[in-house]
């Protein structure tokens, strides 16, 4: 005979893998062309000058320079620019 009761089953124990979203390079920091600035879902932050946007809304630098965040336009949207290195 079994000396212990059989272990019950559970319906828990699953979770999705984290997507590592967020700001990767902050304002004032240097960045190389092609470097990722922000990984995001949707356009929480918009691409500004010298910044490109990937199909998953990732913002990346088009030129070497420094990152600069700014709010502008209708509704004070947040933009990120890359100021080219002198």
UniProtKB/Swiss-Prot annotation:
Record InterPro entries: Ribosomal_bL27, Ribosomal_bL27_CS
Keyword Ribosomal protein attributed: yes
GO cellular component terms given for this protein: cytosolic large ribosomal subunit
Coiled coil: none
Gene3D superfamilies noted in UniProt: 2.40.50.100
Cross-referenced PROSITE patterns: RIBOSOMAL_L27
Residue ranges with Gly residues bias: 1-10
Annotated GO MF terms: structural constituent of ribosome
Region annotation (Disordered) ranges: 1-21
GO BP: translation
Keywords associated with the record: Ribonucleoprotein, Ribosomal protein
Recorded family membership: Belongs to the bacterial ribosomal protein bL27 family.
NCBIfam families linked to this entry: L27
Record protein name field: Large ribosomal subunit protein bL27
């Amino acid at each position: 005979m079994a000396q212990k009761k059989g272990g019950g089953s559970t319906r828990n124990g699953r979770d999705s893998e984290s997507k590592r979203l967020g700001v990767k390079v902050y304002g004032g920091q240097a960045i190389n062309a092609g470097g990722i600035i922000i990984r995001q879902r949707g356009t929480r932050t918009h691409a500004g000058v010298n910044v490109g946007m990937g199909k998953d809304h990732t913002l990346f630098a088009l030129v070497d320079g420094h990152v600069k965040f700014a709010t502008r336009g209708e509704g004070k949207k947040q933009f990120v620019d890359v100021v080219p290195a002198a």
